[in-house]
Amino acid sequence: MEIAKANESLKAAEHCYTEGLYNSSVSRGYYSMYQAAQAALEAAGLKRAEWTHGGLHATFANELTRRRKLYSSFLARDLNVVQDLRHTADYRDSDVSKRQATRALAKAREFVSQIKKGISNG
């Protein structure tokens, strides 16, 4: 997975947010984080043909934040927080609020930015 996919998803999240499509913004924001985490894992030599969401989250947290200390543990936490919001956005009857979408987009931007820095420094 190349970081380009994460960049594209982040752009889509920003566009959706601008259009007031908060559920879609959160969903695309989460996927930008998921794709960036996948790119980080691959850059660290942990490539798989396919990742489950739980497997990717656990490996990112355990391997890249706890064991190797390549990234802040806050990034692993934020990945989980935004995934929970994505579940609301994609699967529940309730909608994501503008405030929630704002926070999720900020977390997605920071996550992708930190992963880009980590990959380019690694």
Regions found by a protein language model. Give the residues of each.
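Terminal alpha-helical segments
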Residues: 1-122
